[in-house]
């Protein structure tokens, strides 16, 4: 316990910030919030316990440039930085380096890498997949320069990717050797406090990186306030409204949809089937083996997925074909209630402005349904999904953002691709075609249009089936609770070192 007490005291008694008075003049082209953020990062590396932290500004506020300017404060070849990011973001780091004339030697690392190669670069940028592959190599006692190099700084971009501390990619990130460690993410917490623990573990934030200590902090009453007192020390999070009153207005509205008679019959019957399957799965807990119980619960989850898809278009839930006498609604060209509402909304925007629109879904097949509808109306669209090669995604992004290109005013976006570093400020309307269980993933997609450089007011339309027994209504209720929890965690708190020490009976 004495060791914990010492670590607690070191964490809370960190040296005060000591800003460089000349920094303002050295960085005239940065915005005020970026200058403040970089000063905070410099102080964390000098005096922080741990050395580093979490830069969690809203998406679109220039976190990439802030990190590059931090590196520029001391760009010696001996003080190397490793940046780990999704594959789609590697070129973004290189582009930002060129755009701001920083002249770093940047190595984009995909394949083999040796120590001699690393010596010639200020920055090595690699992917989470490559990091994990090399982690497996060292577990087999093979060589990897990613892990044999002592980095001056390791930066995890889109760091929420390691939020599950039981995964290999989390363990790989924690195994890197570095003097300073940084997590960059606009959404550090998605669902629960343990999302934050994964970053605290990577940062080596003692004593809280000990899972037993973190578990104790999450016990009993006031756990959120205890977590907040720690987060306040190591996380810098600003939202767009704090940064500037001049940012374009951002409007979010729900667009309600009801079933037609045919869709409602299909949905109600499948919901009854789902309820029966759930009752059967619960009963199996006592009477059948573990494998059988697991299979039955997986079937229930599959049926819930089909309910969600029927709320969008019956074609996505072909399982229901044997429920109705007619199969017309299962055809791809069937105009579902939600599709009609979306198309009316899009037509209105196209006909009353020169704005561009993004349609977002979890299902590529749903996007293809809309692609087909727009083709029938002679409206050109762009597609951006994980099925595209990286160069094709870049082309779609560039084409959509080109103000001179008035032919392609609609982009069909897979939500899995829409949350990671993508810049779509060429558009200013986003239609979320269905709710996602994780509201943070929705927010990431929405921020593709609401970010630095956007000059127009932005609009988000959330399509929601509002039938009494709608699975979409239930998902929205869950979303509201999760968002309220995340907001609570990042509010100000009055707890301090003495409060935490008392909690541990130190």
Swiss-Prot record:
Keyword ATP-binding: yes
Keyword ATP-binding carried by entry: yes
EC number: 3.6.4.-
Helicase ATP-binding domain boundaries: 44-206
InterPro entries hit by this protein: Helicase_ATP-bd, Helicase_C-like, P-loop_NTPase, SNF2-like_sf, SNF2/RAD54-like_C, SNF2_N, SNF2_RAD54_helicase_TF
SMART domains reported for this sequence: DEXDc, HELICc
Gene3D superfamilies (alphabetical): P-loop containing nucleotide triphosphate hydrolases, Tandem AAA-ATPase domain
Keyword terms: ATP-binding, Helicase, Hydrolase, Nucleotide-binding
Positions that bind ATP: 56-64
Short name of one Pfam family: Helicase_C
EC category name: hydrolase
Any one of the GO BP annotations: DNA repair
Helicase C-terminal domain location: 344-501
Organism superkingdom: Viruses
Motif segment (DEAH box): 157-160
GO molecular function: ATP binding; ATP-dependent activity, acting on DNA; helicase activity; hydrolase activity
Family per record: Belongs to the SNF2/RAD54 helicase family.
Name of the protein this chain belongs to: Probable global transactivator
Organism encoding this protein: Autographa californica nuclear polyhedrosis virus
Gene name in the database record: GTA
């Amino acid at each position: 316990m004495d060791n914990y007490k010492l670590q607690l005291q070191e964490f809370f008694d960190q040296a005060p910030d000591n800003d460089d008075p000349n920094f303002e003049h050295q960085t005239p082209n940065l915005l005020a919030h970026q200058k403040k953020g970089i000063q905070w990062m410099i102080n964390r590396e000098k005096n922080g316990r741990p050395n580093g932290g979490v830069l969690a500004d809203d998406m679109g506020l220039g976190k990439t440039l802030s990190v590059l300017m931090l590196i520029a404060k001391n760009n010696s070849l001996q003080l190397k930085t490793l940046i780990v990011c999704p594959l789609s973001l590697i070129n973004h780091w290189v582009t930002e380096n060129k755009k701001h004339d920083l002249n770093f030697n940047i190595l984009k690392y995909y394949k083999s890498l040796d120590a001699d190669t690393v010596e010639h670069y200020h920055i090595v940028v690699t992917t989470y997949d490559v990091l994990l592959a090399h982690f497996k190599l060292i577990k087999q006692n093979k060589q990897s320069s990613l892990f044999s190099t002592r980095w001056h700084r390791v930066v995890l971009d889109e760091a929420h990717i390691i939020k599950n501390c039981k995964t290999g990619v989390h363990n790989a990130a924690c195994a890197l050797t570095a003097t300073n460690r940084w997590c960059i993410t606009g959404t550090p917490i998605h669902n629960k406090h343990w999302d934050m623990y994964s970053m605290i573990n990577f940062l080596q934030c003692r004593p809280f990186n000990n899972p037993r200590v973190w578990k104790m902090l999450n016990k009993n009453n006031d756990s959120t306030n205890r977590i907040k007192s720690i987060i306040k020390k190591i996380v810098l999070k600003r939202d767009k409204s704090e940064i500037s009153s001049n940012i374009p207005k951002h409007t979010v509205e729900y667009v309600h949809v009801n079933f037609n008679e045919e869709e409602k019959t299909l949905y109600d019957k499948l919901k009854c089937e789902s309820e029966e399957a759930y009752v059967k799965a619960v009963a199996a807990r006592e009477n059948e083996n573990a494998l059988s119980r697991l299979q039955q619960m997986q079937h229930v989850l599959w049926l819930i997925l089909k309910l969600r898809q029927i709320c969008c278009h019956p074609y996505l839930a072909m399982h229901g074909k044997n429920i109705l006498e007619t199969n017309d609604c299962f055809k791809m060209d069937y105009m579902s209630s939600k599709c009609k509402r979306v198309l009316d909304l899009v037509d209105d925007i196209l006909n009353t402005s020169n704005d561009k629109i993004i349609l977002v879904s979890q299902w590529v097949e749903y996007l293809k349904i809309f692609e087909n509808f727009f083709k029938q109306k002679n409206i050109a669209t762009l597609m951006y999904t994980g099925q595209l090669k990286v160069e094709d995604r870049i082309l779609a992004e560039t084409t959509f953002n080109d103000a001179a290109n008035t032919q392609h005013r609609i982009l069909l976006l897979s939500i899995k691709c829409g949350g990671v570093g993508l810049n779509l400020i060429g558009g200013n309307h986003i239609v979320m075609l269905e709710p996602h269980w994780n509201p943070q993933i929705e927010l990431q997609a929405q921020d593709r249009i609401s970010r630095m450089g956007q000059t127009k007011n932005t609009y988000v339309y959330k399509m929601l089936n509002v039938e009494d027994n709608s699975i979409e209504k239930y998902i929205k209720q869950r979303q509201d609770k999760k968002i309220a929890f995340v907001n609570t965690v990042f509010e100000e708190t009055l707890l301090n070192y003495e409060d935490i020490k008392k909690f541990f009976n130190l």
